């Protein structure tokens, strides 16, 4: 989410051309979709469907489509593409909220905070690194694919290192699994 926002300013000019610079702000607006849609997809496929709530899940998706259509009808005439982007984000947030409500027996709000705060801190630090890397490379070599790919790589490394330093439980668990597989340990 924050990584997408971090590369937007340098990515749009070389990928779409300078005539599309207004799309940069739309990428900022749409960047929460990475987290929101990912969360709703996980809840839907990993919790609601196996939990026997597939029909309710389908109704939520239809309700989200209705919210999106209504918001598009209201916002696009006044805000054009920005209205469409905002409507999509709002509708997906609506779907995710309803999914969380349907899955409240499995996912408590405190769980999101307890397991998510380290990732949020890592994402904010990563955003700073991505933006700084982009600004530095823009001065040194200009905008282009190499700058964007270096930003992505730097962001991934910083995110990983921050989670490593913060002793993220999931990261250490999976590093342990990888280590045991590489060394042949059970």
Predicted regions and their residues:
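Short membrane-interface helical motifs at transmembrane helix boundaries
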Residues: 1-18
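Transmembrane helix-loop junction
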Residues: 13-14, 50, 77, 104-105, ...
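Residue-level signature of transmembrane alpha-helical entry/exit and packing/kink sites
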Residues: 22-26, 111, 115, 119, ...
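Small-residue-rich segments of transmembrane alpha-helices in multi-pass membrane proteins
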Residues: 61-69, 118-128, 184
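Hydrophobic alpha-helical transmembrane segments in multi-pass integral membrane proteins
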Residues: 69-73, 124-139
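Membrane-proximal transmembrane or re-entrant/amphipathic helices at the cytosolic face
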Residues: 131-186
């Amino acid at each position: 989410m924050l990584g997408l926002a971090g590369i937007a300013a340098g990515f749009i000019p070389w990928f779409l051309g300078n005539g599309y610079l207004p799309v940069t702000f739309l990428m900022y607006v749409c960047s929460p979709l990475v987290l929101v849609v990912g969360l709703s997809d996980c809840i839907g496929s990993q919790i609601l469907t196996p939990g026997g709530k597939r029909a309710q899940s389908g109704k939520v998706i239809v309700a989200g489509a209705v919210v999106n259509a209504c918001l598009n009808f209201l916002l696009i005439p006044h805000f054009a593409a920005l209205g469409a982007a905002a409507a999509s984000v709002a509708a997906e947030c609506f779907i995710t909220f309803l999914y969380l409500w349907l899955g409240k027996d499995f996912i408590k709000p405190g769980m999101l905070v307890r397991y998510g705060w380290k990732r949020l801190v890592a994402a904010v630090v990563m955003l700073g690194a991505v933006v700084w890397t982009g600004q530095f490379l823009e001065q040194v070599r200009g905008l282009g694919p190499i700058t964007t790919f270096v930003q992505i790589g730097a962001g991934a490394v910083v995110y990983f290192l921050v989670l490593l330093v913060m002793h993220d439980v999931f990261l250490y668990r999976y590093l342990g699994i990888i280590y045991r597989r590489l060394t042949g340990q059970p």
